Amino acid sequence: MEVLCSPVNGKATMLENVHDEMFSEKMLGDGIAVIPDENELRSPVEGTVTMIYETQHAIGIQTDLGTDILIHIGIDTVQLHGVPFQTKAKVGDRVKQGDLLTIVDWDMIRNKNMDVIVPIIVTNKRVDQMKTNGDIRVGEP
């Protein structure tokens, strides 16, 4: 069994609470969302970085067992053209759980009246169990 850990400190919530139907209706897969309270976003799993959007608002990682994870950084942040993100990872990088992926300027995102919530989605497998509310720390399942 693979364990998906939180990529950021904050408050865990159900995907149904995300104000974007792609996530709340689980069109991309199941998972959780975290309302972040720090600017460092870390890998939730060990695996390989498979995708980083040009605008740096989303990162994909595949585990060694083939689980595809999508980390979407904020809602509608694609419109910011990468400005609030200092991405440290590159496509093809091997990452361990807890490795730094990107640093996010949440204040800039909030100042643009955008939601800072971070959906973490398993796109190709069923999710059996997850924390769906309350405080969560980097590395906690």
Give short role names for the model-derived ranges.
Residues 1-141:
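Contiguous, well-folded functional domains in the mature portion of proteins
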